[in-house]
């Protein structure tokens, strides 16, 4: 399934992107997600998810950072928060995210996005068996 996936700079920017035909939005906090266009702290994230859902669109949260042991308590708290907010999908790269998400009663769907290149089906199959439902492939791949 192809969808127009965008990374907004702010809640106000989401409104413009909805008007332009965006299907899904990648948002999140800079300390948990990589390559985000804007910072969506918890209050802004709640507002953004509500706006996105009210327009029948999808809210994905980037939790694709690299997490060390000292990040794990904050990571768990953030994933619990994302579950409460009812985000549509988490974009991840670190196995700790999978473990915490799968502790939830109704796990949030996962989208594997390792910041390394995803170039073969072995990688996709491996993470699929671990709970990922989608993968973001390397830009270097052709559609063939």
List each model region and its residues.
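Short beta-strand/loop segments at the ligand-binding rim of alpha/beta enzyme cores
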Residues: 1-4, 55-64, 103-115
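N-terminal basic/disordered segments at the start of proteins
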Residues: 1-26
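Catalytic alpha/beta core domains of metabolic enzymes, predominantly
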Residues: 109-144
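Active-site beta-loop-alpha junctions enriched in small/polar residues
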Residues: 7-11, 30-32, 64-68, 93-96, ...
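Active-site-adjacent beta->alpha loops and helix N-cap segments on the catalytic face
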Residues: 33-51, 92-106, 121, 139-144
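Glycine-rich, proline-tolerant flexible connector loops at the mouths of alpha/beta enzymes
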Residues: 24-45, 62-70
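Conserved, mostly hydrophobic/aromatic
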Residues: 17, 94, 127
């Amino acid at each position: 399934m192809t969808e127009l996936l965008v990374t907004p700079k702010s809640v106000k920017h989401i409104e413009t992107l909805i008007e332009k035909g965006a299907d899904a939005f990648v948002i999140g906090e800079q300390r948990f997600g990589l390559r985000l266009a804007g910072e969506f702290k918890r209050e802004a994230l709640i507002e953004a998810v509500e706006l996105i859902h009210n327009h029948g669109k999808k809210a994905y949260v980037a939790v694709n950072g690299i997490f060390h042991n000292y990040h794990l308590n904050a990571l768990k708290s953030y994933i619990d928060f994302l579950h409460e907010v009812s985000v549509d999908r988490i974009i991840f790269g670190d196995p700790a995210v999978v473990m915490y998400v799968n502790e939830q009663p109704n796990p949030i769907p996962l989208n594997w996005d390792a910041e390394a290149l995803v170039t073969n089906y072995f990688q996709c199959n491996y993470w699929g068996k671990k709970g990922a439902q989608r993968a973001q492939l390397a830009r270097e791949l052709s559609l063939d």
